[in-house]
Amino acid sequence: MAEEKVLEVKNLHVNFHTYAGDVKAIRNVSFDLEKGQTLAIVGESGSGKSVTTKTLMGLNAKNAEIPEGELLFKGRNLLDLKEEEWQKIRGNEISMIFQDPMTSLDPTMRIGKQIAEPLLKHNKGMSKADAMKRALELMQQVGIPDAEVHINDYPHQWSGGMRQRAVIAIALAADPEILIADEPTTALDVTIQAQIMHMMAELQERINSSIVFITHDLGVVAGFAHKVAVMYAGEIVEYGTVEEIFYNPQHPYTWGLLDSMPTVDSSVDRLVSIPGTPPDLLNPPKGDAFAARNKFALAIDFEEEPPYFEVSPTHFAKTWLLDPRAPKVTPSDNILARWKRWEELKGDK
């Protein structure tokens, strides 16, 4: 049975006009988001992750241009909406959790009132008393202890982890169908990160919302996401289920991300990094954007952009290494071990 799609992104392109020229920040990005599922978008800084999510919220800067693409939500192309139409959807049907809770909260407003604010905005008949009652319930749902005592606190009185819980409560206030989380745990320590991720998974199951989770850290999404899109230089270079990306990765950039992840049982003395820097998107390179950093690059990588090769019906990668004519290459021992584990997983099914 096919999953219900709540969002379809098709051939999205986003440019930014600058004095130096047009920055081609997003190039031909497509993906689907299914009901109750989590899609993780992973990549280095500057890969286009945050621009993608801001486009989904209609929050790009004024110098942004979208020359091509569709964002289909409930049969409507969000790119056709006027700002007043966006305001009915933003924070209501589609909500966002931002990276830094301190800059997301108004330091001069009590936290309970900030949580109640979107309720009053999107429910015109709701009284302030009912909104505050619901705000208290939301604070309890996101695990804020003694919520009734702290509902009138100001943001500076709370720790970073508690502030992030408040931001999540605000995002969940209207029971959104889609929740976009832009690196929501980056500013938190590892223990609090795990608590926030666990809480978000529980809340998702309870309200059956769909999540787009942005991160630069593949390790964060291992036990949380259903599907993963790996972004590089404004493009999705690999897309698959979380198991396919972790245990059967096919793109050299994905290999590099996985090799740079620390693991508890690793015998490696030092972490591996991906050499070089991402390309200048004012003038994207000819061919494969990752070619200059790819030690497995073929001659064709510098001349012709690769298509998406199908690895499975749910798994695609944009690399010439998957062309039947390409030579076989040997990635790191880490990737070979993952491939071996993939064969074992397939055998268990």
Swiss-Prot record:
One of its GO terms (molecular function) is ATP binding. One of its GO terms (cellular component) is plasma membrane. It is found in: Cell membrane. Its EC number is 7.4.2.9. CDD domains: ABC_NikE_OppD_transporters. It is an enzyme of class 7 (translocase). SMART domains: AAA (SM00382). Keywords: ATP-binding, Cell membrane, Membrane, Nucleotide-binding, Peptide transport, Protein transport, Translocase, Transport. It comes from the Bacteria. PANTHER family: DIPEPTIDE TRANSPORT ATP-BINDING PROTEIN DPPD, OLIGOPEPTIDE TRANSPORT ATP-BINDING PROTEIN APPD. Belongs to the ABC transporter superfamily. This is Dipeptide transport ATP-binding protein DppD. It comes from Lactococcus lactis subsp. cremoris (strain MG1363).
